[in-house]
Amino acid sequence: MPASGHNPQYSLGSTDAEHERLIWQSSRIAPLTERLFREAGIGPGQRVLDLGSGVGDVAMLVARLVGPSGEVVGVERDTHSIARARARVAESGQRNVSFTESDVNQIANDTPFDAAVGRFILEFLPDPLAALRSVSRLLRPGGVLAFHEPCYAPFLLLSAHLPLWSASVSLIHQTLLRSGANTEIGLDLHRIFLEAGLPGPAMRMEILLDSDPDFTRWTHDLLRSLGPQIQQQNLSLEPLGDFATLPERLQAEVAASKTVVPFVALVGAWSHKPIDQVPL
C-alpha cells in the first residue's frame, strides 16, 4: 500500500498538456517497455489486455508486437484519455486495438486473454494486489502478466548533487506520496505477484540518464501537471523560483555540472499464470 496510507488517485490529471507529456515520455521509454514485453513472450497472434491505457501508447506498442492477427484491448476509466487514444489509433491505421471505459477491477470479458500488461498503473491503485488477482482471472492458463512500474529511490539519490534538480524531483516525489501513490511499488512487485498466487516474476531495473533539454523539460512538465495536487497537498512551487524559467535554469545547472540526470527508475516484472488456474 502507499506509504501515505491514503487512497491513491491519478495525480497528474487529464489535460491536453498532460497528454502531450505522456506521449513524449513514452517515446523515451518505449524501447525499455518493448524489450520487457518481448522477453515476457508477448508476440504475434496474441490477445492482450492493457491496463490503464491513458492515451494509448502502451496499447499501440503491444499492437505492433501482436501484429494484425492479434488483438489489444485497452482499459481506461478517463473519458478524455480514451477519446485521445482512439483518435491516435485511428490516425495510426492500426485496426487491432480497441478501448473500453472501465475500472481495472470491473472488466467484463468472455474470451480469455493471452497476456495482461500495464505501465505506471499499479502505483496509483488502492489495492494493486486485488487488481492483479482480478486480472489474472481473465487470462488463459499459462498467460503472461507483465508490468513496468517506478522506483523513485534511485531517482532521488542520483539527483542529490544538483540543488535545483534535487528540489524539483523531491517536490514531485512528495506530491505523489501525499496523493497516495506507491512510489516504490517497482521493488514490491515480487511480493505482490507471489501474494496474487503467481510464480515469482523475472525482474529488472533500468534507469535512463541524459543531459539534453528535453530531459529537463520533462521535469518542468511533470510539475505543471502536478500543480493542482501540489496546492491541495499543502506543498508549494515557490522554492523553485520563477516557474516559467525553470526548464532553462534546470538545464543550466545540469550543463554546469558536466553530469547527467536520471529519469525515474523503471522496474519491469513478468510472470505466467499457473497452468492449473483456469480463467473465470
Regions found by a protein language model. Give the residues of each.
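Class I SAM-dependent methyltransferase SAM/SAH-binding core
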Residues: 49, 55-106
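C-terminal helical/coil "lid" or tail adjacent to the Rossmann-like core of SAM-dependent
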Residues: 11, 15-18, 200-261
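A short glycine-rich, Lys/Arg-flanked "PGG" loop and its adjoining helix->strand segment in the class I
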Residues: 129-144
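Conserved catalytic/acceptor-binding region of the Class I
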Residues: 146-214, 229-232
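Conserved alpha-helix/loop element of class I SAM-dependent methyltransferases that forms part
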Residues: 27-46, 61
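A short acidic, Gly/Pro-enriched loop at the edge of an enzyme's catalytic core
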Residues: 106-115
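A short SAM/SAH-binding and catalytic strip from SAM-dependent methyltransferases
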Residues: 114-128
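N-terminal, positively charged/glycine-rich alpha-helical extensions of SAM-dependent methyltransferases
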Residues: 1-19, 24
